[in-house]
């Protein structure tokens, strides 16, 4: 903890930083390791990043191939009391699918290019963009809030109230997307890059 009594939370990517910010308000000190737009696949932690992880109370990462550096860092630090949350462990996972312009929208072939789904170890063939699903965001936010309440029990009511409010907002957004999907005129989405929204579109069939 910091001298002001706040717990320290470190996140790898912005979605989880934002979840913590929505759930914890000013009760925690949050550090984001990768700035928005950074490529997590090419990220290498700086010494200051490793120090931040060692000194934090909760460390939140995505897990999977994009965070393959995490286990090495965690094994190297002396503080073994850091609570580690790998978000891919908190939601149902979906296998990567080929969704480029040369395939039909409902293709279910595994991606086999050089950096996706190829020569991966077992357990690494899943699509890692789990945060794009609003329903996954609800699951992950609830788990993060529970961990905050466990580590910082004196502020449990505060975290629980914010969890209830935030999940209510997410649920409302989910209902709006459901309504849009139920009234859609087309079943096609066009992307000019690798398709990152498998979890999102799966929520709405």
Task: Give residue ranges: language-model regions.
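Extracytoplasmic metal-acquisition and chelation regions
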Residues: 1-205
